[in-house]
């Protein structure tokens, strides 16, 4: 089983779409093995997205991710990373495929409802940022 990390971003929480997006995730065959509602500070958002520090959108991303609560989750499924990225769609909702999370719910490239890890290696690192081993509940 492969794992991936997702974050339901502040726009998702503000729009009261946690249930709708979580339902779509579960219907796609993912198991949620860790989940919590939290709020990132500018510092923690900056740490999480440090890989983008030199990119022009970094400041806006940190501001947005610290603007309200978010819901990180660890998901488990065969081929989890690729399947989840297909489920959520392109970063820009205008380019996302019909029926994807971002096409359905996102307003813009900057406020695009959800984060999804881009590799199994990054998923493990990102999961460790939000969850301790004790918080991960394996479902049989």
From Swiss-Prot:
Write the record's keywords in alphabetical order, separated by commas.
ATP-binding, Cytoplasm, Kinase, Magnesium, Metal-binding, Nucleotide metabolism, Nucleotide-binding, Phosphoprotein, Transferase
Location in the cell: Cytoplasm
Question: Active site located where?
Answer: 115 (pros-phosphohistidine intermediate)
Which top EC class is given? Answer: transferase
Pfam families (UniProt xref): NDK
Q: What InterPro entries does the database record attribute to this sequence?
A: NDK-like_dom, NDK-like_dom_sf, Nucleoside_diP_kinase
This chain belongs to the protein called Nucleoside diphosphate kinase
Organism for this UniProt entry: Chlorobium phaeobacteroides (strain DSM 266 / SMG 266 / 2430)
